[in-house]
Amino acid sequence: MKKNTNFTQINNNFYRLVDDLFLKIEDNLNFYDDKIDIDYEVQDYVMTITFLNKSIIVVNKQESLRQIWLATKFNAYHFNYKIDKWICNRSNKDFWEIFEKSCSIQSNENLIFTAFKRIKK
């Protein structure tokens, strides 16, 4: 049986994109580590973020759909990777815009994440 190398390449690329996103999320959360109480745990591509008020946000991958899902206290979002960004399939907003606003609301803090402002090298 011939191996489908195109599928493998797409799958590997998806995991690289997800890994990159999760690392950027961690970098941004760690920036606030000594300023506010934010805990996060990553297990099997599911990141659970818990704020001091016990409010939770979950970020996870949906491999079969090639999507990132974001679950907040108020809504759920599905993101597809388009033109170097994770874009919400309903609102067409960037992941970082929604994630930053959701974290700010749920933590009762004005959080500003820099990952979406970084220039790609």
Curated annotation (Swiss-Prot):
UniProt xrefs under CDD domains: Frataxin (cd00503)
Keywords, alphabetical: Iron, Metal-binding
The keyword Cell membrane belongs to this UniProt entry's keyword annotation: no
UniProt entry tagged with the keyword Metal-binding: yes
HAMAP family, alphabetized: CyaY (MF_00142)
Function per UniProt: Involved in iron-sulfur (Fe-S) cluster assembly. May act as a regulator of Fe-S biogenesis.
The protein's name: Iron-sulfur cluster assembly protein CyaY
Source species taxonomy: Bacteria, Pseudomonadati, Pseudomonadota, Gammaproteobacteria, Enterobacterales
